[in-house]
Amino acid sequence: MGFFKSFFSGKANNPEEEKQKNKQKNFEIFKYDGMRAQRMGRADYAIKCFTEALALQEDFETMGYLAQVYIQSNEPDEARKLLEKMTQIEPEHTSTFLTLANVCYMQEDYAAMAEAAQKAIAIEEGNAMAHYLLGKADNGQNDGIMCIAHLTKAIVLKDDFTEARLL
């Protein structure tokens, strides 16, 4: 059968290519099953699917989905490890640093939160959310003056920033 297939199609069977295609197919199945599970509220199954997908292929987008599920499942330690790995893979991705800062806030690690927010500001100076998170970190470290300075900067950048005004 393989002889006729290769004879009529003009291609020889390449087992390595088939293996790679199968691996890619399995990766996509796990990734999209995880996305469906996440939408249905099945965090445990979503974590399992995303973990299996990442075992097959390291993918930034899938890591982001897995970090979201960890946050939703109240597993900030796992989310933080994954987000720190993501910042090493793509160090110019502002939203990863913002998410990391939020996770650090959940853990009450204000120094790490400030560091993540400062990195986001270094990438994108005009990001009001980064200044707001830095202000929250300053507030957590009892640095009132810097807190006010960063919150003021956030309000200047985004005039209708209600959260910054309330803090």
State each model region's role.
Residues 19-61, 65-72, 102, 106-108:
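Alpha-helical segment of the N-proximal tetratricopeptide repeat
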Residues 24, 57-58, 91, 125, ...:
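Short coil turns that delineate tetratricopeptide repeat
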